[in-house]
Amino acid sequence: MLETPAGRLWLKRVETLTLRWRLLKGGGQRSFEKDRDGLHFLGEAGMPVAPILAEGPDYFVTPDLGVTLRALMSDTGASDDRRAAFHAAGRALAALHAQGFSHGRPAVRDLCWDGAEVRFIDMERFSPRHQSPRHFAADIFVFVHSVFAAGGGEAELENALTAYRNAGGPLQASIALARRLRWIGPAARGLRRLKPHSRDLTALEPTLAYIASAR
């Protein structure tokens, strides 16, 4: 983070990864380039993403876009702001899908709220080729799962998915996917005996149940 007379800026550089993380995430340069290229591509398409203010071969700079939805969920005194932010998140995701784009990983830590709108960051999983209802359904799954994993629940999701649906977001593919994958819930329950503190495993069953019952 950089404090400047023009405001707060964020500097992103190529990550230096250990062998283990390179195997899991791919090379740091490749992830950096996908993130930067995704921000450029979607920004030029008029989508709500972080604008790149300056860049070089191994860095780029974006403005501060406010608080992430993940951080906002931890602020117990921001209930009105949280409702507005999740409503805006649903609209932003619907706008992305309406133009035939998917984010790839729209988790609550990758959506920023500035008090007026939600914008997306971290586009390492974005691909302009991922344009099908299956990819939109995966976005919804990642978003809902991230809410439950962060300790949120139906209040936040109702705001987001109502706004998503009202803005023309296609939920039917997400509902169908969740119903097909319901068998994962009991399997995750068994795995939690081995990893009882895993938030990701704990969030799987409520994620599938919530999406499968959506209307």
Where are these regions (language model features)?
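Structural motif at the C-terminus of the N-lobe alphaC helix and the adjacent alphaC-beta4 loop
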Residues: 30-33, 37-49
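Catalytic-loop of the protein kinase fold
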Residues: 98-108
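ATP-binding glycine-rich loop module of kinase domains
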Residues: 1-33
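Conserved hydrophobic alpha-helix
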Residues: 42, 92-96
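Conserved protein kinase catalytic/activation segment
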Residues: 110-122
